[in-house]
């Protein structure tokens, strides 16, 4: 769809596609006619294929865009590799830094939600470690604490920023009830929320609460279903494939559309000088910068 739109804009694009499964020898695929003429290759899906494909692209000055969740660090040593996927540790560090930057004047309140799996423990532990290093005081409370004990964790003189240790919807909704009770019993407390990317899935029914508590959600994408450009693309998708977009976040089809538009436009505009930096951006993404 992205290539079709670019063609209507006057660009000439030739597309080749290869179905390369996990057991395929990528070296054999690279010997096929036409591969060496590519300006950009999107893939691979499997980590073991990254190194030979990256080496091939480097030797022929072909851009390699890896949008999938692979392991490896070719992006650090190969200037022709663009690795879109970021591992959990990198995203956690980015979220911690975003918190420290935006809430330096706030009082952090960590709420234990009694989630036995607790997949967000890595984030809360990393954030608390940085707060300790910086000498920032914070309080810890529990979602099941009595109202008076819960309230003691909150500052009456500073804005409070609440961090839950889970991204699950039931616990989030229970936290909203707890915060509303706090507001009733102790009016005047300023409360904000720092959440998780998963919370974007709850926006359709939690939007009012998100606004009420000035919620910040760290994310590498944003799907705006109300945007005219997004609605136009979704209509076109239904026309092409006779079904709506998969209900997932991010919308994978829009991710692919954004990637194709960004890299193809960039290469056509800047040629071998294209590095993908912000000064070369000539496309406004719909969802994924």
What is each of the regions a protein language model found here?
Residues 1-289:
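Extracytosolic ligand-binding ectodomains
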């Amino acid at each position: 769809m992205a290539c079709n739109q670019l063609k209507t804009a006057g660009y000439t694009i030739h597309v080749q596609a290869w179905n390369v499964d996990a057991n395929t020898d990528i070296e054999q695929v690279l010997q096929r006619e036409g591969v060496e003429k590519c300006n950009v290759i999107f893939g691979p899906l499997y980590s073991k294929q990254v190194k030979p494909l990256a080496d091939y692209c480097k030797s022929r000055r072909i851009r390699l865009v890896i949008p999938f969740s692979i392991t490896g660090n070719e992006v650090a040593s190969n200037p022709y590799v663009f690795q879109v996927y970021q591992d959990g540790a990198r995203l956690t560090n980015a979220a911690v830094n975003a918190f420290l930057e935006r809430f330096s004047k706030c009082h952090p309140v960590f709420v234990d939600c009694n989630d036995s799996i607790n997949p967000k423990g890595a984030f809360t532990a990393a954030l608390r470690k940085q707060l300790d290093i910086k000498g920032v005081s914070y309080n810890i409370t529990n979602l099941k604490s009595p109202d008076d004990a819960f309230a003691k964790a909150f500052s009456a003189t500073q804005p409070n920023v609440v961090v839950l240790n889970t991204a699950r919807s039931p616990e989030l909704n229970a936290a909203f009830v707890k915060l509303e009770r706090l507001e009733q019993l102790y009016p005047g407390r300023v409360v904000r929320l720092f959440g998780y990317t998963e919370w974007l899935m709850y926006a359709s029914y939690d939007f009012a609460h998100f606004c009420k508590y000035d919620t910040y959600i760290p994310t590498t994408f944003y799907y705006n279903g109300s945007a005219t450009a997004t609605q136009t693309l979704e209509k076109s998708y239904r026309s092409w494939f006779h079904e709506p977009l998969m209900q997932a976040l991010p919308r994978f089809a829009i991710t692919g559309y954004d990637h194709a538009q960004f890299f193809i436009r960039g290469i056509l505009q800047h040629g071998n000088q294209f590095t993908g930096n912000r000064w070369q951006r000539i496309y406004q993404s719909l969802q994924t910068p």
